[in-house]
């Protein structure tokens, strides 16, 4: 009985590892897609964009 339990646990671990390694199916559209730069302005550009959208809390001193 103990050997059967160990065998079932090992099988479950192997199956879950196989699913993690394979992941979801690779779609043809994903393979052909051109990667885009989500952070084209860098960290500073991202910060300035947020600052412009939300407004400056120190209005007289904002540049």
UniProtKB/Swiss-Prot annotation:
Tissue expression remark: Expressed by the venom duct.
UniProt keyword annotations, A-Z: Amidation, D-amino acid, Disulfide bond, Hydroxylation, Ion channel impairing toxin, Neurotoxin, Secreted, Signal, Toxin
One Gene Ontology molecular-function label: ion channel inhibitor activity
Modified residues (Cysteine amide): 62
Propeptide regions on this chain: 24-54
Disulphides: 56-62
Modified residues (D-tryptophan): 58
GO cellular component, one term: extracellular region
Localization per Swiss-Prot or TrEMBL: Secreted
Description of its domains: The cysteine framework is C-C.
Family: Belongs to the O2 superfamily. Contryphan family.
Misc. comment: Exists in two forms, due to cis-trans isomerization at 56-Cys-hydroxyPro-57. The cis conformation is the major form.
This protein's name: Contryphan-S
Organism: Conus striatus (Striated cone)
């Amino acid at each position: 009985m103990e050997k059967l339990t160990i065998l079932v646990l090992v099988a479950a671990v192997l199956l879950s590892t196989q699913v993690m390694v394979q992941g979801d199916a690779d779609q043809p559209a994903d393979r052909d897609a051109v990667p885009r730069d989500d952070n084209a302005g860098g960290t500073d550009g991202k910060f300035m964009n947020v600052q412009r959208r939300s407004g400056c809390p120190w209005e007289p001193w904002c540049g």
